[in-house]
């Protein structure tokens, strides 16, 4: 089936699709707090979703393109589930968030199929994959249209992989007691086996969102990167997130000794946001398999255990947490109780001495991850390093922080 036909088949109207903001039923919706963070973007009045412009630009989307798509959504006069929120247009049509971003992705998909130069075609496919991923954002369970956009994002990424200079392999990992999961191994030029970083992403992202991390930071150092979707999204959608948050990544980590392109004696884990929960858990449970663990803006305790902090983050992020836990219609109190069980301190891990070297980067006044969170991680390690990243200028400091983390990982792997 051609890519164009796949798009038509997937998005063919069958019934009234649920609108994203209605999928998680909040019992006590409060006022939307004003939030701005490097990794998550910011709350913008009249938008349900956090607008994560920095990360979208970092992934290769042009700022003007973002504004153009947003403008189309704002200008729509179609019915909305909440007349105050632009991105709540009902149904797959003009003005709907998923429709507009997927339509933009199809423009790049078309360019990719018509481009004779393989590398350029690969870049266009990658661009399309990123746009399809934004269409599916924030990847809530039960969002039929978003899940279809995810399928197109993964398909476009596979097409990009065949054309881009980096060597990429799709690897299936069997998981006892359930469906296998698929990861992407990104390899730098040269002969393997390579030292490898296991990437653990945030709960509101797909594994394909981190290609820039490999291309700009790890590949130049001769380091491979293995990605895996977090439980309940993408290729891991058949798995619910549980208190054993590192289950899928742990099985992938154990399987690395059987993968010829990976030097399984030189492996590190890197966690963004809740992905740090997975990475730090692995630092304790699999210290013999990991040379190092790095975190950025980690979510390992404070947000999971402090009701005040939970009240200070945007509605969309709480919806993401509830969705990952399979608690779409739970009371706020029930959600709070359940979230506390995911704290690595509550689980009795963090605070105990850990032999794995751990580094954690943080921003001052980060609503999702206070400085104490990173201090808790680094002080628990026998070889801990704390990295403060100044907020402004945002893009340059984000890049500088990633370079510092890459340097630290490289020293421990190479």
UniProtKB/Swiss-Prot annotation:
Pfam family, one: FrsA-like
E.C. no: 3.1.1.1
Keyword Nucleotide-binding among UniProt keywords: no
Catalytic activity: a carboxylic ester + H2O = an alcohol + a carboxylate + H(+)
Signal peptide: none
Keywords: Hydrolase, Serine esterase
Single GO MF descriptor: carboxylesterase activity
The UniProt record lists the keyword Hydrolase: yes
Superkingdom classification of source: Bacteria
InterPro entries cross-referenced by the UniProt entry: AB_hydrolase_fold, FrsA, FrsA-like, FrsA_esterase
Biological role stated in the UniProt entry: Catalyzes the hydrolysis of esters.
Family to which the UniProt record says this protein belongs: Belongs to the FrsA family.
Family annotation (HAMAP family): FrsA (MF_01063)
Protein's name according to its UniProt entry: Esterase FrsA
Origin species: Enterobacter sp. (strain 638)
Gene: frsA
């Amino acid at each position: 089936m051609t890519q164009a036909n796949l798009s038509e088949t997937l998005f063919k109207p069958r019934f009234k699709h649920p609108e994203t903001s209605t999928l998680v039923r909040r019992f006590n919706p409060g006022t939307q707090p004003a939030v701005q963070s490097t990794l998550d973007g910011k709350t913008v009045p009249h938008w349900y979703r956090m607008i994560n412009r920095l990360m979208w630009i970092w992934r290769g989307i042009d700022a003007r393109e973002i504004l153009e798509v947003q403008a189309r959504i704002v200008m729509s006069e179609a019915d909305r589930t909440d007349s105050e929120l632009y991105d709540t247009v009902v149904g797959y049509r003009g003005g709907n968030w998923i429709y507009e971003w997927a339509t933009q992705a199809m423009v790049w998909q078309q360019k990719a199929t018509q481009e004779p130069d393989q590398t350029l075609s690969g870049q266009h496919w990658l661009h399309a994959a990123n746009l399809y991923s934004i269409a599916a954002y924030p990847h809530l369970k039960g969002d039929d249209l978003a899940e279809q956009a995810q399928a197109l994002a993964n398909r476009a990424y596979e097409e990009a992989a065949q054309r881009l200079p980096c060597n990429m392999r799709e690897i299936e990992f069997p998981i006892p007691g359930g469906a296998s999961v698929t990861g992407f191994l990104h390899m730098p030029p040269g002969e393997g086996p390579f030292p490898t970083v296991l990437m653990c992403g945030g709960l509101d992202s797909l594994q394909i969102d981190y290609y820039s991390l490999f291309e700009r930071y790890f590949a130049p150092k001769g380091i491979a990167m293995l990605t895996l979707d977090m439980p309940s999204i993408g290729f891991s959608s058949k798995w619910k997130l549980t208190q054993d948050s590192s289950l899928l990544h742990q099985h992938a980590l154990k399987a690395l000794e059987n993968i010829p392109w990976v030097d399984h004696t030189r492996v590190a884990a890197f966690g963004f946001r809740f992905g740090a929960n997975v990475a730090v858990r692995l630092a304790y449970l699999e210290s013999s398999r990991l040379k190092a663990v790095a975190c950025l803006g980690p979510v390992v305790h404070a947000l999971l255990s402090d009701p005040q902090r939970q009240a200070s983050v945007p509605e969309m992020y709480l919806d993401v947490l509830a969705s990952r836990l399979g608690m779409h219609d739970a009371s706020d109190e029930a959600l709070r109780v359940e979230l506390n069980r995911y704290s690595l301190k509550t689980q009795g891990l963090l605070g105990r001495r850990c032999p794995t070297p751990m580094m954690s980067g943080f921003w001052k006044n980060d609503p999702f991850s206070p400085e104490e969170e990173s201090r808790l991680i680094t002080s628990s390690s026998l070889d801990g390093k704390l990295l403060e990243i100044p907020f402004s200028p945002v893009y340059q400091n984000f890049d500088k922080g990633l370079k510092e983390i890459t340097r630290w990982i490289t020293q421990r792997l190479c």
